[in-house]
Amino acid sequence: MEVALYLLPVTLGDTAIEKVLPSYNREIIVNIKHFIVEDVRSARRFLKKVDADICIDELTFYPLNKHTSPEAISGYLAPLAEGHSMGVISEAGCPAVADPGADVVAIAQKRNFKVVPLVGPSSIILSVMGSGFNGQSFAFHGYLPIEPADRMRRLKELEARVYSENQTQLFIETPYRNHKMLEDILKTCRPQTKLCIAANITCEGEFIQTKTVKEWKGKLPELNKIPCIFSIYK
C-alpha cells in the first residue's frame, strides 16, 4: 500500500457498511495505524464496523475539530513524514467536505504528501443527485443564521442567486430545528421556487422529494431530529 494521507468516508447513519462503502476501503483501513478523527469514540465504532478484528488499542488517534490549532494539525502529520500512512475520519460522510478535515489536507498538500480520497457517501452530492436541480453549478452554505431577521435575509440572498446565476443552493439546520427552517423557507421564498428536502440519506426512512414552495405549504413531512439537507432552485 502506498504511503499517503487517506481520506476515509464513513456511513451517514446506522447503514450497513457494505451498502455504501466499497470493499477496497477496508483493505486500506486495516493497514493504517494512525487516524486523524473528528470524534474519537465514533471513529473507533466505525473501525470496528469495518473489521471486528481491528485492535483499537494498537491505533493512535489525533482529534481534529474547530478548536484544534494549525500547529497541532501540522504536528499530527509526523507519522506520515516518517513513512506511515494515515487516515482522516469525519463523524459522518466524506472527510474534508464541509468538514474540519480540509485543514489537515491543506497542510498535507503544502508539504507535498500524497493525498488519496476514497469513495463513499456524501450527503451533499447525493441530495443534489436526487433533487433534479442544477448539478453543474451548486453551492453548499452549511448553517444559516439563527436570528430570524438575519436568516430570512440570507434566504432571500440565496434565492436571488438561484435566479441570477442558475445555481442550486444547499444548506442545513440542527435537526431539532428542521421544522422552523421549513417554516421560514415557506414564508420567505417565492411560491414558484423549488425546494428539495433530503432527509436520512442512505438510511432507513430515507426521504428525498422536490416540490415548489407553494406545493409544500400544508404538506410538510415530519423531520424532527432527522439529519436533513435543504436545497432550492428554480
Residue ranges of each PLM-predicted region?
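Glycine/small-residue-rich loop that forms an oxyanion/phosphate-binding "nest" at active or ligand-binding sites
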Residues: N65, I73-V115
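A contiguous loop/helix-start segment that scaffolds small-molecule binding in enzyme catalytic cores
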Residues: E2-Y6, H84-S85, S164-K234
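Glycine-rich, flexible N-terminal cofactor/catalytic loop recognition
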Residues: M1-L64
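Conserved helicase motor
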Residues: Y62-S69, L144-P148
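Short glycine-rich anion-binding loops that position phosphate/pyrophosphate groups of nucleotides
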Residues: L12-D14, E91-P95, P175-Y176
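Acidic beta-strand-to-loop metal/phosphate-binding motif
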Residues: I36-V37, G87-G93, T168-E173
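Class I SAM-dependent methyltransferase SAM-binding "motif I" and its flanking Rossmann-like core
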Residues: Y6, D103-R161
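Short active-site oxyanion
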Residues: I29-F35, N112-V116, T168-Q169
